[in-house]
């Protein structure tokens, strides 16, 4: 063989060997290929990886195909979790790998440090929340005060407080102006909203009575609940009747509604009489003959004014009380009386001949009801019927007073009318049986006959208690009779 042919043959064999190697591809270590002597071939790359699994390093070695290599997924490492390498020579992945050493762990927190770490942020957040709520409430209060100031400031300027007037001055101004009813409505609102309540002095079916202070003066505040708005409105309306004001009728000062944020209170402000009701007064005190006459005359005077119609442009309609009893009569400092609680009162319009009866389901006190009311024979279309019923009740109040009158050192203990005939809270039926069927009346003790004043008072009582209402005395007649008695007893009512 010539040298030239021998060279050509060698070149051909070399090319065949190279082609064979290229066809075989890249050889790599494969830990999962135990059937092929832990070797694999690929057109892509050799792959070696170490991964942290359950706290231990796990080594993987294999081949990566060309599509997988192009996806650029297998050849990326993750800090402290995996370390991956790709290479492109035979068995280049036959290497030893380790994950990078992690930085030393931060010191663990103990119970105390952990408590501090949790508690401090919580406390700071709580304080921030409370400060935020407080700031919002303060802003709201400031807004309300500003709003209230803007609403009420004209009233204060209009009124009274700055003028230095007393309640007596205001009442006198209202009387002198010709109305004789009460201060103007703007003045009433100003007074009511500047009263400071002191203490509760009584409770009733309507609500509560409080002792209050206004500009250093004592006032009484009758507080109705919103469900008794009809009673509050009616009583305020009656008290503001033209020419009603009288020394023996409770002095009306103001009526207003007050919203305390939760519910609405209805206020009726009047003069304050520290001795309380006649009921309380008689329970605590014994009265002299002159004292008895003064009390009786003041009641008759107040009732006569209430019953009387005053004709004229500034006239007053006739009014019947409908709930006369010792608890609805107050005792003043001078030991005279003032009739109060006009919530059930009725007015008579003589021109139209109509009776203004309140739309109120409540009736008077059963113990003090006249016979015609108990047996339902009262003619409610005639106004005189209501006045006659008042007279019957006044006769019972006089009996309560007379029992506490001391004559010759003898005095009866205080009792309510019919105390020995009916229970403490009698029903209509029980009162009807005693008053209408048996025609009984409170007992007049024999010792009253030894005192002229008590004899006269006893006669007045009997004439107030007639079963026939038309036969009873009028309030004016009672007043005149007791006035004569007052002269004899040298008392000044």
UniProtKB/Swiss-Prot annotation:
Ranges of residues in domain GS: 165-194
Active site: residue positions: 323 (proton acceptor)
Domain Protein kinase, residue spans: 195-485
EC number(s) given by UniProt: 2.7.11.30
Cofactor: Mg(2+); Mn(2+)
Record's subcellular location: Membrane
Enzyme class name: transferase
Binding of ATP, residues: 201-209, 222
Organs and tissues of expression: Expressed in brain, kidney, lung, liver, testis, ovary, adrenal gland, heart, prostate, gastrointestinal tract, and spleen. Distributed throughout both adult and embryonic central nervous system and pancreatic islet cells.
Leader sequence segment: 1-25
Residue ranges that the UniProt entry lists as topological domain Cytoplasmic: 135-493
GO biological process terms held by the UniProt record: activin receptor signaling pathway; apoptotic nuclear changes; apoptotic signaling pathway; cell differentiation; cellular response to growth factor stimulus; cerebellum development; hippocampus development; insulin secretion
Keywords linked to the UniProt accession: Apoptosis, ATP-binding, Kinase, Magnesium, Manganese, Membrane, Metal-binding, Nucleotide-binding, Receptor, Serine/threonine-protein kinase, Signal, Transferase, Transmembrane, Transmembrane helix
Transmembrane regions listed in the UniProt entry: 114-134
CDD domains, sorted: STKc_TGFbR1_ACVR1b_ACVR1c, TFP_LU_ECD_ALK7
SMART domains xrefs: GS, S_TKc
Subunit structure and binding partners: Binds the type 2 receptor protein ACVR2A.
Family stated for the protein in its record: Belongs to the protein kinase superfamily. TKL Ser/Thr protein kinase family. TGFB receptor subfamily.
PANTHER family: ACTIVIN RECEPTOR TYPE-1C (PTHR23255:SF58), TRANSFORMING GROWTH FACTOR-BETA RECEPTOR TYPE I AND II (PTHR23255)
Functional summary from the UniProt entry: Serine/threonine protein kinase which forms a receptor complex on ligand binding. The receptor complex consists of 2 type II and 2 type I transmembrane serine/threonine kinases. Type II receptors phosphorylate and activate type I receptors which autophosphorylate, then bind and activate SMAD transcriptional regulators, SMAD2 and SMAD3. Receptor for activin AB, activin B, activin E and NODAL.
Name of protein: Activin receptor type-1C
Species for this entry: Rattus norvegicus (Rat)
Organism taxonomic ancestry: Eukaryota, Metazoa, Chordata, Craniata, Vertebrata
Gene: Acvr1c
């Amino acid at each position: 063989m010539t040298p030239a042919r021998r060279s050509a043959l060698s070149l051909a064999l070399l090319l065949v060997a190279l082609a064979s190697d290229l066809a075989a591809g890249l050889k790599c270590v494969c830990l999962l290929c135990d059937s092929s002597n832990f070797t694999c071939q690929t057109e892509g790359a050799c792959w070696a990886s170490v991964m942290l699994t359950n706290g231990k390093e796990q080594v993987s070695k294999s081949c990566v195909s060309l599509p997988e290599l192009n996806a650029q997924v297998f050849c990326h490492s993750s800090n402290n979790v995996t370390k991956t390498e790709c290479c492109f020579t035979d068995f280049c992945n036959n290497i030893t790998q380790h994950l990078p050493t992690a930085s030393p762990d931060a010191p663990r927190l103990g119970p105390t440090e952990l408590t501090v770490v949790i508690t401090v942020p919580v406390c700071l957040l709580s304080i921030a929340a409370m400060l935020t709520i407080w700031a919002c409430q303060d802003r709201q209060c400031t807004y309300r005060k500003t709003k209230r100031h803007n609403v009420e400031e004209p009233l204060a300027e209009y009124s009274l407080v700055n003028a230095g007037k007393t309640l007596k001055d205001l009442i006198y101004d209202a009387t002198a102006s010709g109305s004789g009813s009460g201060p103007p409505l703007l003045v009433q609102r100003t007074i009511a909203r500047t009263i400071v309540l002191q203490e509760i002095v009584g409770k009733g079916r309507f609500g509560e009575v409080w002792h209050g202070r206004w500009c250093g003066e004592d006032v009484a505040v009758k507080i109705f609940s919103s469900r008794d708005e009809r009673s509050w409105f009616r009583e305020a309306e009656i008290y503001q009747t033209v020419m009603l004001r009288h020394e023996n009728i409770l002095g009306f000062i103001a009526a207003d509604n007050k919203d305390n944020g939760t519910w609405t209170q209805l206020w009726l402000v009047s003069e304050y009489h520290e001795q309380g009701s006649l009921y309380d007064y008689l329970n605590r005190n014994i009265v002299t003959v002159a004292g008895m006459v003064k009390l009786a005359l003041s009641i008759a005077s107040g009732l006569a004014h209430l019953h009387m119609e005053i004709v004229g442009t500034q006239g007053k309609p006739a009014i019947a009380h409908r709930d006369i009893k010792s608890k609805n009569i107050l005792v003043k400092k001078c030991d005279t009386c003032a009739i109060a609680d006009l919530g059930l009162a009725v007015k008579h319009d003589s021109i139209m001949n109509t009776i203004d009866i309140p739309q109120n389901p409540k009736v008077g006190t059963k113990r003090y009801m006249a016979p015609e009311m108990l047996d339902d024979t009262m003619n409610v279309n005639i106004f005189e019927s209501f006045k006659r019923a008042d007279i019957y009740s006044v006769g019972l109040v006089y009996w309560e007073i007379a029992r506490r009158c001391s004559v010759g050192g003898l005095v009866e203990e205080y009792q309510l009318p019919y105390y020995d005939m009916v229970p403490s809270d009698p029903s209509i039926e029980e009162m009807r049986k005693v008053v209408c069927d048996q025609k009984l009346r409170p007992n007049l003790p024999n010792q009253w006959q030894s005192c002229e004043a008590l004899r006269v008072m006893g006669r007045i009582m009997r004439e107030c208690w007639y079963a026939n209402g038309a036969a009873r005395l009028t309030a004016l007649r009672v007043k005149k009779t007791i006035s004569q008695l007052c002269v004899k007893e040298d008392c000044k009512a």
